[in-house]
Regions:
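A structural signal for short, well-ordered beta-strand segments and their strand-loop junctions
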Residues: 27, 63-67, 132-139, 205-210
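Active-site and ligand/interface coordination hotspots across diverse enzymes
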Residues: 1-44
Length: 239
């Protein structure tokens, strides 16, 4: 059996100088720190979800903001690539929605695989540096960042495709197109993270921010209930 590799000079220096860092970090979904990247209609705060961030700060964790995978895969902050089939029922693109959705998901998975590889490199870097990655916080009902609940993208698409432009309100978007189309399972980005962590032999406890509670104005805690599952490619919820 091979022994553990010797600590690097940088790690030895950190141990020698003993500064005030807590050596614990939590990976946090991008929109918990910046709701400007939320889907249209889904932002409930001008910026960060203060109680979520405050809980982590009070517990002494460093906060590592994950990339917003949807911004990077779907055309930018407003995610224009995801909007082509909105209000499309009765129009030219609507009969092609199944084919277009399959192509959209294939593209999304390709981008998410690349992003997940970088996140896993970050996790490995923290661990080599003697810093514990104590958890990852996803977003419930997200098609990308859901840990145990995600979005039925096809069902959500049917809601927004059938809704006339003038009738699409925040309530329709949040209650029908998002919360009304939730299902058990993990989002596409979390699934990519699962696979990449398994390949590197790494594990990260996973927590989930309750988007429904946030949208409906309820307070919640991220860490008190304990991790919902461990991201490592094993025991992945079924699609």
């Amino acid at each position: 059996m091979r022994g553990r590799s010797a600590p690097s000079p940088a790690r030895l220096l950190l141990d020698q100088l003993r500064d005030e860092r807590g050596r614990r970090v939590v990976l946090v979904s991008h929109c918990l720190l910046n709701e400007n990247t939320r889907y249209a209609g889904g932002a409930t705060r001008p910026g960060a979800v203060a109680e979520a961030v405050g809980e982590l700060i009070a517990a002494g964790y460093g906060i590592h903001q994950l990339p917003c995978p949807e911004r990077l895969a779907w055309g930018g902050v407003l995610k224009p690539h995801s909007l082509h089939l909105y209000h499309s029922k009765g129009r030219l693109l609507y009969p092609l929605r199944g084919l277009l959705l399959r192509a959209f998901v294939v593209w999304t998975r390709m981008v998410y695989r690349r992003l997940a590889r970088q996140v896993v490199r970050d996790v490995a870097d923290y661990q080599r540096s003697g810093i514990t990655v104590a958890g990852m916080v996803g977003i419930g009902a997200s098609p990308s960042c859901g840990v145990t609940t995600t979005l039925d993208i096809r069902a959500s698409l049917e809601v927004v495709a059938a809704c006339p432009t003038a009738a699409l309100t925040r309530d329709v978007m949040n209650e029908r197109a998002v919360l009304g189309c939730r299902r058990k399972g993990e989002g596409l980005f979390i699934a990519a993270l699962d696979r990449q962590l398994r390949r590197r032999g790494l594990q990260v406890p996973a927590f989930e921010h309750d988007l429904a509670a946030e949208l409906r104005g309820s307070q919640q805690t991220l860490l008190t209930p304990g991790a919902l599952r461990t991201l490592d490619g094993l025991g992945t919820p079924g699609d």
